[in-house]
C-alpha cells in the first residue's frame, strides 16, 4: 500500500435507485479531524478542479455499480499533495455531514433515500446537478479541546441556538438536558451556507459566537480557532491540521485577546458617552418655556 504523508480526506456522495440510475452529488472535504474523526466538513472542497471532481465522482459511481449498490452512500478517498486519489472505504448510509451536500445541491437526501426504498426512480439526472454556493458544518461535541478532546458530561445549563440567514442547526437537545457518558458526545451539527466560501465561513464564525452553551465543555472554540487560521482560510491543510497547527493554550490566548478587545471597545464607548454628556450645557437641556419664564 502506498504511504500518503499529507492526505486530505475527500468523500463523494452517491445515490442509486433500483432502476439502475446512479449519480454523484459532488464532494465533501473532511480533513479537519481529531483522533482520525471529523470535526469540520465543507462542500465543495477548496482544492478540487472541475476535472478532478468529475474523475472522483465517476470513480465513486463505479464503486457503487461494482456491488449493485442501492440507496444513499458515501465513497471515501484520500487525496495526496499531487492530487492523486486513493479509495479508502464506502459507508453504506447517510453520513453525519450530509447537510453540506444538501445545502450546495438543493437535494433533500433523506427524502431521496426514502423514495429509493419505495422503489421510485431518482427525480433528477447527473446533468441536472449543479454546485451552488458553499457550506460548512462544525460538529458541536461535548469535549474538552484543552484536554486532548476528552468527552465531557454534565447538564446543559444554557443552550441557545444561533439563528439567521444561512444558518442551520441539527440537534436533539434542549436546555436542562443531560449529556451522559453512554453515547457519542455530539450535541449538534451547526451548518452555514453562503454564496461563496468566505461568506459561509464568516457566517459560521458569527453563528459560533451566538451559540450559547454552558454546563459542559464543547468544541466550539476549537472550531472557531480553525476557521480563523491562515492555513484553513487559504485551503492549505490536510488531516494533520491538529498535529501541526493546534495547541490547547492557543484557545486561552484567543479568549484573552477577545476579552481585551471587548474591554477596549467598552472603554471607548464609555468615553464617547461621557464626552457627549459633558458637551450638553444646562441651557441646552432647558425647555424654551422654562427659559421664557425666567426672563
Label the predicted regions.
Residues 1-295:
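ATP-dependent carboxylate activation and anion-phosphoryl transfer catalytic cores
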Amino acid at each position: 500500500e502506498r504511504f500518503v504523508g499529507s492526505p486530505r480526506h475527500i468523500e463523494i456522495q452517491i445515490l442509486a435507485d433500483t432502476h439502475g440510475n446512479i449519480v454523484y452529488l459532488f464532494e465533501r472535504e473532511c480533513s479537519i479531524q481529531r483522533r482520525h474523526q471529523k470535526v469540520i466538513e465543507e462542500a465543495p472542497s477548496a482544492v478540487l478542479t472541475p476535472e478532478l471532481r468529475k474523475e472522483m465522482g465517476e470513480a465513486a459511481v463505479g464503486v457503487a455499480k461494482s456491488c449493485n449498490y442501492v440507496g444513499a452512500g458515501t465513497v471515501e478517498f484520500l487525496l495526496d499533495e499531487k492530487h492523486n486519489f486513493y479509495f479508502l472505504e464506502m459507508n453504506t448510509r447517510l453520513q453525519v455531514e450530509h447537510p453540506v451536500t444538501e445545502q450546495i445541491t438543493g437535494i433533500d437526501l433523506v427524502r431521496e433515500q426514502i423514495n429509493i426504498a419505495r422503489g421510485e426512480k431518482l427525480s433528477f439526472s447527473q446533468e441536472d446537478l449543479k454546485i451552488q454556493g458553499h457550506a460548512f458544518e462544525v460538529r458541536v461535541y461535548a469535549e474538552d479541546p484543552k484536554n486532548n478532546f476528552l468527552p465531557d458530561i454534565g447538564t446543559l445549563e444554557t443552550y441557545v441556538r444561533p439563528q439567521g440567514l444561512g444558518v442551520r442547526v441539527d440537534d436533539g437537545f434542549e436546555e436542562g438536558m443531560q449529556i451522559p457518558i453512554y453515547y457519542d458526545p455530539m450535541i449538534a451539527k451547526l451548518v452555514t451556507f453562503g454564496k461563496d466560501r468566505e461568506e459561509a465561513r464568516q457566517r459560521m464564525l458569527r453563528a459560533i459566537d451566538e451559540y450559547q452553551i454552558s454546563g459542559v465543555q464543547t468544541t466550539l472554540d476549537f472550531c472557531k480557532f480553525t476557521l480563523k487560521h491562515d492555513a484553513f482560510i487559504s485551503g492549505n491543510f490536510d488531516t494533520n491540521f491538529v498535529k501541526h497547527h493546534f495547541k490547547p493554550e492557543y484557545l486561552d490566548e484567543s479568549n484573552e485577546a477577545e476579552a481585551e478587545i471587548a474591554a477596549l471597545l467598552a472603554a471607548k464607548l464609555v468615553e464617547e458617552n461621557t464626552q457627549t454628556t459633558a458637551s450638553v450645557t444646562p441651557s441646552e437641556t432647558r425647555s424654551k418655556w422654562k427659559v421664557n419664564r425666567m426672563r
